[in-house]
Amino acid sequence: MRILLFEDYSRLHTLIAKGLRELGHEVTLVGNGNMFHGLQRDIDIRRGSGPLAGIRHLIRLTSLLTRFRGYDIVQLINPDCFGLKAEREYPFYRFLRRHNRKVVAGAFGCDWYWVDNGLHHKTFRYGDFYIGDTMRTDAAAQTFIDEYCDTPKGDYTRYVMEDADWIPTCLYEYQACYGRYFPVKTQFIPLPIETECSQPVHAFDGK
């Protein structure tokens, strides 16, 4: 199969790409290197800096569109993976949907569903927004609320997740969350782990 992996978190897509290639699939990884992590990618969409960075990034993404079609599967690391304001990401997602067979949207990090579940369903005894029955009011929790609740970014996230063909979750916490909203198309797929090491690891003997 031809598979397009869009963006990466903590080498998740890097390791998936490696495994799929070993199985004989053609894989293209697009991303910004997960920012300062500098992860490997086949097509670089790292956004620059400066007052015109957004416009330059938009032009570059548009120029690359022909390379993002004709795949059997496109997997997004997160709905918000193009490096643009949410209002400007719709056309790029729709292009991927229109010109590829299947679109998979990963539940691999925070988005509207994670925030909504944490605020209103409290699936876990403690989490990003509650500890027991006490709501967190610290800056870290409020940042996620401000980012996704009643915002264009939250609306865009819901649009993509509702439209996607499949939603893989990489942690059981995400499965418990997304399974509430999408019980049919949500599937738990554990994080890939690379067991081979280029350098030997020596156990610490305490001396």
Annotate each predicted stretch with a short phrase:
Residues 47-67:
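Glycine-rich, highly charged phosphate/nucleotide-binding loops
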Residues 68, 119-124, 158-163:
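A conserved, positively charged/aromatic
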Residues 1-43, 98-102, 164:
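N-terminal subdomain of nucleotide-sugar transferases
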Residues 105-150:
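Acceptor-binding helix/loop patch of EC 2.4 sugar-transfer enzymes
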Residues 114-115, 145-186:
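A short, active-site helix/loop in glycosyltransferases that binds the activated sugar's phosphate group
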Residues 2-6, 66-88, 102-106:
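Short N-terminal targeting/anchoring amphipathic segment
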